[in-house]
Swiss-Prot record:
Glycosylation sites: 91
Residues forming the catalytic site: 194 (proton acceptor), 198 (lowers pka of active site tyr)
Gene Ontology MF terms: oxidoreductase activity
Function: Short-chain dehydrogenase/reductase; part of the gene cluster that mediates the biosynthesis of PR-toxin, a bicyclic sesquiterpene belonging to the eremophilane class and acting as a mycotoxin. The first step of the pathway is catalyzed by the aristolochene synthase which performs the cyclization of trans,trans-farnesyl diphosphate (FPP) to the bicyclic sesquiterpene aristolochene. Following the formation of aristolochene, the non-oxygenated aristolochene is converted to the trioxygenated intermediate eremofortin B, via 7-epi-neopetasone.
Major location category of this protein: membrane
SUPFAM superfamilies per UniProt: NAD(P)-binding Rossmann-fold domains
Similarity comment: Belongs to the short-chain dehydrogenases/reductases (SDR) family.
Official protein name in the record: Short-chain dehydrogenase/reductase prx4
Keywords: Glycoprotein, Membrane, NADP, Oxidoreductase, Signal, Transmembrane, Transmembrane helix
Transmembrane segments: 238-258
Length: 329
């Protein structure tokens, strides 16, 4: 269940009262983020549902696959390498696919045949300090590698495009979940490009959350902070834990992924364009769940509610009017 919202701070309410005195029409933003309690027993049965997961052979993707499978879903694991022996659920199929290859992704989706839930999870970290100078044999500045861009952004966009295309053609709706990162909200200075791309994935969710529901398709993200996977093995996570800093298990993040695909919401994150019904019960959509240690926090609703504060009241009003003018739905 989503908890009751806490009241806004006194200072914020006074600010809103001042604006009302100047005849500015506002809806009071709610000032606190939303903590979530997610348990595997709350996940509904998914018998007959088909789930495709990129980067599904290990880490967060594999953890989500096992949870989906225990709920009765049929799983297709897209990855460059198969899962370790005995780790994949029985009702799963491994499909070799490189998410940077459109041809391989198309073939993987075609082999799956039907898609109800799609999890864009494949990702890599930065291979070297991106903005440090490295030189070739002639002493010239070397072109940097773009694996982190190709896998994390291009691969996610292509995977999402294929998933949405299949869901539209099927005419039965569906759910897309993207593995973003806490660095998309709180960048790491030693991972500048990775952080920027993860911020871009959150932006992709924001950009699509008003258009996909017309096809009964939802799109959400999960933003893991430090999580024990191949990208953050235990020998690196150990010192963080020893210092008392929160570290999540892959299972905990995987549970947030599954929840994002099946949950309901009592209201939209925000309205767009000509929309005027915010308090509309519907599929969980346009949201990001931060996983930090053993805690879950939904981030997007509060950011949207507080938009007039950080974006500016006049800017928010004019931008909304621009969106409505260009909204031809």
């Amino acid at each position: 269940m989503i908890p009751r919202w806490q009241p806004a701070s006194i200072a914020l309410l006074l600010h809103l009262d001042t604006l009302r005195c100047h005849h500015v029409s506002v809806r009071p933003p709610r000032a606190t983020m939303t903590s979530l309690s997610i348990k595997e027993e709350d996940i509904p049965r998914l018998d007959g549902k088909v789930v495709v997961i990129s980067g599904g052979a290990s880490g967060i993707g594999l953890a989500a696959a096992n949870i989906f499978a225990r709920a009765g879903a049929k799983i297709f694991l897209f990855d460059r390498n198969p899962p370790d022996s005995g780790e994949a659920p029985e009702n799963s199929t491994f499909i070799k696919a490189d998410v940077t290859s459109w041809a391989e992704l198309k073939a993987a989706f075609a082999q799956a045949g039907h898609v109800d839930i799609a999890v864009a999870n494949a990702g890599v970290s930065e291979e070297q300090p991106y903005f440090e100078d490295t030189f070739d044999e002639q002493g010239e500045l070397k072109e940097p590698g773009f694996a982190v861009v190709d896998v994390n952004f291009k691969g996610t966009v292509m995977f999402t495009k294929l998933a949405v295309s299949y869901m539209r053609k099927q005419g039965k709706g569906g759910s897309v979940v993207i593995t973003a990162s806490a660095t998309g909200y709180a960048p790491e200075q030693n991972l500048p490009v990775y952080s920027a791309i993860k911020s871009g994935l959150v932006g992709l969710v924001r950009s699509l959350r008003s258009t996909l529901p017309r096809f009964d398709i939802s799109i959400n993200a999960v933003a893991p902070a430090a999580t024990i996977t191949k990208l953050l093995p235990m020998d690196i996570a150990g010192p963080l834990m020893a210092a008392g800093l929160p570290v999540s298990s892959a299972h905990m993040v995987g549970l947030a992924v599954v929840y994002s695909a099946v949950a309901r919401q009592p209201r939209m994150v925000e309205t767009y364009g000509k929309e005027n019904m915010l308090d509309l019960e519907s599929k969980w959509n346009g949201r990001t769940i931060l996983t930090l240690g053993e805690h879950y926090t939904e981030l997007e609703e509060k950011l949207a509610d507080l938009r007039p504060v950080w974006f500016g009241w006049r800017n928010t009003d004019l931008t909304k009017k621009q969106q409505a003018t260009a909204d031809f739905r």
